[in-house]
Amino acid sequence: VFDMSIQTNPDLRRSVIYELYVRSHTPQGTFRAVEPDLPRIRALGTDILWLMPIHPIGQENRKGSMGCPYANRDYRTVNPEYGTLEDFLHLVDAIHDNGMKCIIDVVYNHTSPDSTLVHRHPEYFYRRPDGKRGNKVGDWTDVVDLDYDVPGLWDYQIESLCYWAQYVDGFRCDVASTVPVAFWKKARQAVERVRPGAIWLGESVHLDHILAFRRQGFYAATDNELYDAFDVLYPYDIWPLYEGATGGALPLSRYFSALNFQELSFPTWYNKLSCLENHDQRRAAERFPNRDSLLAWTALCYFQKGTTLLYAGQEISAVHTPSLFEREPIDWTAGEDLSPLLRRLYDIKKRLPTDAVFHVDADDAQGIAVAFYQDGQHLAVGVFPLAGRPGTVSVPLADGSYENALTGEAVTVQNGRLTVSASVIIL
């Protein structure tokens, strides 16, 4: 019997994923050019390297001069811009040799309009009321949607996944909410026979996206439904609250109440991706221009329950998000190097009791969050001055002296309260 409570690996909650766009990672923009950087990426504290789409990009209705990697032409070959299949497999071997797992992006909601499937299997595509191929999201002009009411499409896609699973350790599934959960479950079971323990990260979508789809009569799955097939899901269900709280439009407590609600409303094995940025969102260093605030949010991103995501460049406080449609190599000399902090946070993350109940309290007036894990045996507490200011807050600890796991410094709890400077405390 397929049972996600058994199937999923709880250690993923203590893992870190590094998202890498081959085109922008180096001036060369190739698979081979990534390899020399792998030891550094591993040393940051990376368990899993996620390669954004590696497949050929369509020419028709292409965005920009080079095209978007999420408008792919062929699910079973690699983008010649990046190199050959041999180059890709060499990179995957190098990732494994550096002690990391490798997952690749799969974009199964849509293809480019000139996909290799258009002529071979025209029946695989969604048709608009006028009978023409199209998509359900108006501004995605460089793609056409697939139709999962066609059984043959399921077989083709699962065969593709099983082919890549010979080499990679799992998949990040684009717009996973709009592809049937029943398909993902069947795909997971098939891949498990090829790659036992494969990792499944799903891009679950914003709630308003689900609502818009359903109002039009289209399929869209909730996060609760997707947890029947995925190990890790995106935090987009509460992303607008994160943006509101970090932008000053909402109190911190509004965001953290939603985070606490997740803890008690999702299946016990749930795992939410903990991230401050990704390729579709603003850079954290641009969102948090106050350095102490950036460091506090970064520490919380590692401390909170769920797999942590780093987007390449985040470790050097990059403020510019590389274009998806052009070659914009990351300037690795531009910002402050956070690598030593990230490594310390990674080491702490590995020790967190992530099976315990997780909860966050916020002091809105001071801009401080107190997060903790607690069960009958474990207690781990983090104090995060998210506004970058000192303050004094209540903590669920007995009075006494404790060591800050992040700095090694002694801190004192007195009358159930702890005074924090602008720096994070983890006990």
Give the label of every model feature segment.
Residues 3-18, 22-47, 53-165, 186-195, ...:
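Substrate-binding/active-site clefts of carbohydrate-active enzymes
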Residues 15-19, 48, 101-103, 170-172, ...:
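Structural preference for beta-strand elements that scaffold enzyme active sites
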Residues 270-336:
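Aromatic/acidic polysaccharide-binding cleft in carbohydrate-active enzymes
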Residues 413-427:
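C-terminal beta-strand-rich structural cap/linker in extracellular carbohydrate-active enzymes
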